[in-house]
């Protein structure tokens, strides 16, 4: 009986080793767990009515995403990565990149103060205090950035910060393609 008990930890260790090895093989075969697909790719931004971050009572709906290609950047003051990407978003906006901000599950006063202090790269800042639009978009956390075409259709989802590397390699070429399509 005692010998059988000694095998239980060995069996548990072997099971964990198999699970670990399986995950390593999955990651090597291209199944990247950091890539979060969106069911909204190819679909219009979901319907919503949200207030402007700085002007409570001023409402916007999904029509703000129609007319020209743009980025929808999901951000919050509680998000350290959002802080890290913010100066780069300011640079992109200064270069003419159209960006709408979605302030996600945040304190409105802190968010307004953040933009006043760090600069505001957003054409419009939507306030999603309860996270309902974020939920409809499938947001897991902040930051996330969506490429939206001129018809209000989600074309790409980027999880994590927008930085010079991923902007140049992935996001900018896609954004430029959307600008060409819109002509």
Where are these regions (language model features)?
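N-terminal targeting signals for export/organelle localization
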Residues: 1-51
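Conserved Rossmann-like nucleotide-binding pocket used by diverse enzymes
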Residues: 46-49, 75, 100, 135
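Short gly/ser/thr-rich secondary-structure transition/capping motifs
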Residues: 29-31, 51-58, 125-128
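Hydrophobic beta-strand anchors of alpha/beta hydrolase catalytic cores
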Residues: 71-72, 99, 145
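Thiol/disulfide oxidoreductase modules built on the thioredoxin-like
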Residues: 116-121, 128-179
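A short beta-strand-turn-helix
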Residues: 48-70
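Structural microenvironment flanking redox-active thiols in thiol-disulfide oxidoreductases
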Residues: 83-119, 129-136
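Short pre-active-site segment immediately N-terminal to redox-active cysteine/selenocysteine motifs
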Residues: 44, 68-70, 74-78, 141
